[in-house]
Amino acid sequence: MKIRASVRKICEKCQLIRRRGRILVICSNPRHKQRQG
């Protein structure tokens, strides 16, 4: 899980979702997981 100021999709399978007021990226590739800090 990378914590970044700006999150973006890295590949086609990345999905931007909002959980509890945070923006997350979930993907089939675990390296692409991100959270906005």
Curated annotation (Swiss-Prot):
One GO cellular component term: ribosome
Location of this chain's protein in the cell: Plastid, Chloroplast
Cystine bridges: none
Xref: InterPro entries: Ribosomal_bL36, Ribosomal_bL36_sp
Single Gene Ontology MF annotation: structural constituent of ribosome
Keywords linked to the UniProt accession: Chloroplast, Plastid, Ribonucleoprotein, Ribosomal protein
A biological process term (GO) from this entry: translation
Chief site of localization: plastid
Superkingdom of origin organism: Eukaryota
Transport in keyword set: no
Plastid listed as a keyword: yes
Family: Belongs to the bacterial ribosomal protein bL36 family.
Protein name (record): Large ribosomal subunit protein bL36c
Organism of origin: Chloranthus spicatus
Taxonomy of the source species: Eukaryota, Viridiplantae, Streptophyta, Embryophyta, Tracheophyta
